[in-house]
Regions:
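GAF sensory/regulatory domain recognition
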Residues: 43-50, 55-88, 100, 107-110
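Signal-transmission linkers at sensory-effector interfaces
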Residues: 2-31, 36, 141, 158, ...
Length: 194
């Protein structure tokens, strides 16, 4: 009974910590209407939560078929990754097509081969990876990719749940920013006609 009580107490503490993180991200998102500001706010918070983890936020432009990387860190440094065409294979294509989270905690080379994935030029092969879709409506518009280049089994079920919740919040904020930009554009067009 004591062990069960301790386990439940620990779970409650962990869940309370997750909710505090989610609330702080929600507060940051509420103050932000620019898309890049949203990428930066969420990306910075994820890096803080996951001990300065390497991560990228990838956005799919369905019109051009390109993947853009508005936020990317590797080895503790912000990096620029050139936009690239979305291929038919790979982790990114799979997540965008299925809208499913992918967790790879071991045997990364095997998982990469199975998915037809490859290491982006100028980046390192990870040992653990977490890919969480950014879904708006019925489409995955992008994803958050969290990686660990040093450890296998880096991501727990609670890590996955937390990142999924943050991705959902980010998706809503990005859609709101997109709609705000569209409304502003239409308003300007209307004013110019009058």
């Amino acid at each position: 009974l004591f062990n069960e009580t301790q386990r439940l107490f620990k779970e409650s503490e962990q869940r309370a910590a997750e909710l505090a993180i989610i609330n702080s991200v929600q507060a940051a998102l509420a103050a932000e209407l620019s898309m890049q500001g949203i990428y930066d706010a969420v990306g910075d918070k994820i890096r803080e939560i996951f001990d300065q983890a390497d991560l990228s936020i990838r956005i799919h432009d369905a019109r051009t078929g390109l993947i853009h990387y508005p936020y990317a860190y590797e080895g503790g440094k912000r990096i620029d990754i050139a936009s690239s065409p979305l291929g038919e294979a790979g982790f990114t294509a799979h997540v965008l097509r299925t809208r499913e989270t992918v967790v790879v905690n071991e045997n990364m080379a095997d998982a990469a081969t199975r998915h037809g994935s490859f290491v982006l030029p100028g980046t390192l092969m990870e040992k653990s990876a977490l890919f969480v879709p950014l879904v708006a409506g019925d489409q995955a518009r992008g994803l958050i990719n969290l990686i660990d280049v040093e450890r296998e089994n880096a991501y727990s079920a609670s890590d996955v749940r937390l990142l999924q919740t943050l991705a959902n919040s980010m998706s809503v904020a990005l859609e709101n920013a997109r709609l705000f930009d569209e409304t502003q554009r239409l308003l300007k067009e209307t004013e110019q006609r009058n």
